[in-house]
Amino acid sequence: MSNEEAGQYVLKCGNVSMTIDAAKGGKILSYKYDDQEVISQLKWPESFGSTFWTSPQKEWYWPPVPEYDKKPYAVEEKEGVLTMTSEVNDKLKYRIRKAFKTDEQNQAIVVTYSIINVSDETRKVAPWEITRVQNEGGLIFFEAPADSIWPAGLMNFKDANGISCYEPDEANENRKVNADGKGWLAYLNREKGLLLVKQFEDLVAGQPAPDEAEIQVYVNRGKTYIELESQGAYTTLQPGEELNWTVRWYLQPSTPASSDALVQQVKNMLKTDK
C-alpha cells in the first residue's frame, strides 16, 4: 500500500494494482494488470473510475451526492486495511465508509462499503457500486436468462447456456437495464485481453431497493462509456446502525476460445462450480 500522490493511494496484489483518490470522493481511479488499465479514464464528470452511491436513486435523483461522490474522505491505514470515511450529507443523514484490502491467496482486492445511519430516525437503504468501462470492443456478461432482463429490448443481450452476454453497441440515447444475477458481474476487454470480475452478495427476489436490481448495466449515449452496477440488499437501519457490503474485485489476462471457456475462467477465479 502506498501514497503516491496527495490523496491518492495504491493497493497492489500480485500483478494487479488499484488506485483510490481519497481527496475526490474516495473513487477508484484506476484498476490495472501490470500497466494495462481496465476502467474508464475519461475526464468529464461522472464518466470515469468507480464510485459508490446509496440506493434507491429516487431519494436523491441527480447529481450524485457530493459528500459521497466528490468531497474528501478521511483516511486511516491500519493492519493492512485502507479505510476512507465520508462526511455526512445533511439531507440523507448517512456517512459512507470504504475499506480496501488485498487478498493475496485469491489474487483479489476486497472492498467493503458501509452505510451508517447518523440520523435519529429509522431508515431503509441499499448499497450501490458503479464502475465505468470504455464502450469499445468489450463483452459484458453475468448469470441470468437474457429474457429476464428488463426493460426488454433496450440492449441486445444474447443467451449462452444461462449466461447473458452483451457486446456494447452505439445509440443516440442513454440506456439502462436491470437483472437478477447470481452474485457476479464480468467485463472482458478484448483489446487488452483482460477479464474484470466483481463478486458480491447474491440477492433473492424482494431484497433489492424499490425499482432497483442486483445487477444493472447503463450505456451512455454514443460510443463513450458503460457503467457496471451492482447493489446489495435494501436494509432497515435504526439510528446509529450500519450495513456492510463487500465486493471482491478480480482482474486476469483472458483469451477465451468460447463463451463456455470464459464462464469457466470466471468460476475458476471465484472458486465456484455453481
Model-based region annotation:
Residues 1-3, 12, 57-106, 120-125, ...:
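Extended, loop-rich substrate-binding clefts of extracytoplasmic carbohydrate-active enzymes
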Residues 4-6, 14, 274:
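Sequence termini and other peripheral, non-core segments
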Residues 8-70:
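Acidic-aromatic substrate-binding/catalytic surfaces of carbohydrate-active enzymes
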Residues 8-10, 30-32, 83-85, 114, ...:
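Residue-level detector of beta-strand face positions
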Residues 9, 16-18, 23-29, 37, ...:
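A contiguous, surface-exposed recognition patch within enzymatic or periplasmic domains that forms
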Residues 96, 109-111, 243:
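Hydrophobic core residues within well-ordered beta-strands of beta-rich domains
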Residues 251-274:
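Terminal connector regions
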